[in-house]
């Protein structure tokens, strides 16, 4: 990558729109907790296809982590990407703040996220509150872009043309304090 093409997140600004891309499941993070829930707490049957899953639990747990490079390239050719983050261990609350400059925060609305059933099962089995789930797992969103509000439609179109199913998650707003606020939590 040429130095002038590096996306540093420095361009993230008030009013930017946050666009999320679906995860393929748990991804490669949170497995210490997942193992504890599956083997110690729930004593789940790895061969069983639980409600909401379309394959046995063991296959769901081993679903490979998505790589988002094609989406990044498709989007950067159409609009200026102000920021991006991969939702890994630490969920929304640790990863989104990494792309947000001081004096700004992300306000997230989860209503349009297609939450994979594996997260519902883990939450039910371990009786974990929803805020903690968003603090630990990707909850169905594996990658997030920040783009200018004026570029929102072009960004969504470019991502859809690249075979993605993007969802608008929220906006960057001005304010001090928590860098990630999820409505309703």
Question: Where on the chain are the PLM-derived regions?
Answer:
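Short, compositionally biased
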Residues: 31-42
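Glycine-/charge-enriched secondary-structure boundary and capping motifs
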Residues: 44-47, 51-185
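Glycine-rich anion-binding loops of enzyme active sites
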Residues: 1-31, 171, 183-185
């Amino acid at each position: 990558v040429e130095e002038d093409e590096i996306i540093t997140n420095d361009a993230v600004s008030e009013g930017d729109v946050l666009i999320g891309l679906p995860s393929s499941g748990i991804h490669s993070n949170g497995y210490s907790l997942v193992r504890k829930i599956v083997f110690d707490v729930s004593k789940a049957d790895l061969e069983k296809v639980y409600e909401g899953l379309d394959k046995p639990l063991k296959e769901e747990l081993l679903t490979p982590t998505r790589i988002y490079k094609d989406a990044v390239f498709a989007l950067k050719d159409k609009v200026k990407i102000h920021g991006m983050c991969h939702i890994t261990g630490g969920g929304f609350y640790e990863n989104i703040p990494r792309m947000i400059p001081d004096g700004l925060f992300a306000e997230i609305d989860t209503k349009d996220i297609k939450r994979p059933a594996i997260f519902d099962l883990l939450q039910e089995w371990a009786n974990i509150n929803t805020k903690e789930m968003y603090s630990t797992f990707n909850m169905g969103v594996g990658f997030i872009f920040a783009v200018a509000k004026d570029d929102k439609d072009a960004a969504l179109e470019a991502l859809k043309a690249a075979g993605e199913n993007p969802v608008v998650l929220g906006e960057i707003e001005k304010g001090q304090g928590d860098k990630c606020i999820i409505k309703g939590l």
